[in-house]
Amino acid sequence: MKKKIAEYEVGEQVDVFLLIKTATKGIASNGKPFLTVILQDPSGDIEAKLWDVSPEVEKQYVAETIVKVAGDILNYKGRIQLRVKQIRVANENEVTDISDFVEKAPVKKEDMVEKITQYIFEMRNPNIQRLTRHLLNKHQNEFLDYPAATKNHHEFVSGLAYHVVSMLDLAKAISNLYPSLDKDLLYAGVILHDLGKVIELSGPISTTYTLEGNLLGHISIMVNEIGKAADELQIDAEEVLILQHIVLSHHGKAEWGSPKPPLVKEAEILHYIDNLDAKMNMMDRALGRTKPGEYTERVFALDNRSFYKPSFHN
C-alpha cells in the first residue's frame, strides 16, 4: 500500500495522487505569478508552490481538483513542504471519488449522534432541552458533515461534531468536579456554540467562508438562530437570553471575536473547554506526524511553537 502524505519524511521522493484543498495566487519577487496550493489526502495536508504559472495553469489547479504530483519533501523554515517537480490533473479513469482524499473524524457519525442525543436527554430544564433539540434537528445533516474550521483545529470531515462530543465529555467531567455548574446550560452551550458554522462555512470539502460567514460570522448567526427557535417554540424565558450570551461570549474577548466577555459561570467554563479541546487537537495532530525525540513543525495557531515529542513516547 502506498504511503500517505503525512508519512513521508524530509528528503523522500513523492509520486502520488492528492486533492487540492486550496489554491492561492501570489506574486514573486521577480514579478511573476505563483500559486500556493494546499494538497491533501486522508492523513493530512501539505503546502506546495507552483512557480511561474500562466492564466491557463491557474485555471487548472483549483480547489477540489485531484492531481498527480511528483517531487520531494523539504523543511522550509520549520514547515514541511512538498517541492513540486511534476504535476498534472488526474484522469477520470485514475481516480474519481474526492471523498477518498479527505481526512475524517475518527468516530462514526452514528456513534456521535447517539452520544449527543444522550446528553440532550439528560437535560432537566425543558426550555433548554427543547431549544437545543430543535436547533440540532434543524441542522443535523450539516452538523455531522462539516469541519469545525477552515484551518488550525478539527478542520476535517465531521470535525464539528467530533469537537462537540469531546467538549461534552470535558463538560461532564468538570460538572462532576464542580456541582454548582448548571449542566443543562453547559451542555447546551457546548452543542450550540459552533453550530452557526454550518451557515458560516461552505461545506466539508475545500472549505471556505460563505457570504454570511464573511459578513456575519458563526457567533452572530447562532445568536439569531436561537432567537428564531425561541419564537417558533413560543419560549419566552430568561434561558433564551443566557444561551445567546453563552454563544456570544465563547471566544472570551473582543479581540478574539466575542462582543462580550463571559458573564455567567457556564459561559466562562465553555470558553476554557473550547480552547482546551482545540489546542489538544492541534498538538495531537502535529505530534502524530512526529517521531519520538524530534520536534513538530511549527504550529502557527499555538504561537508558532514547535512541540517536542519525548523519546520514550513510542
From Swiss-Prot:
It is an enzyme of class 3 (hydrolase). One of its GO terms (molecular function) is DNA binding. It comes from the Bacteria. One of its GO terms (biological process) is rRNA 3'-end processing. Keywords: DNA-binding, Exonuclease, Hydrolase, Nuclease. InterPro entries: 3'-5'_exoribonuclease_YhaM (IPR020873), HD/PDEase_dom (IPR003607), HD_domain (IPR006674), NA-bd_OB-fold (IPR012340), NA-bd_OB_tRNA (IPR004365), YhaM_exoribonuc/phosphodiest (IPR050798). Residues 14-90 bind DNA. It holds the Pfam family tRNA_anti-codon. The keyword Phosphoprotein does not apply. Coiled coil: none annotated. Gene3D superfamilies: Hypothetical protein af1432, Nucleic acid-binding proteins. Belongs to the YhaM family. Shows a 3'-5' exoribonuclease activity. This is 3'-5' exoribonuclease YhaM. It comes from Bacillus anthracis. The gene is yhaM.
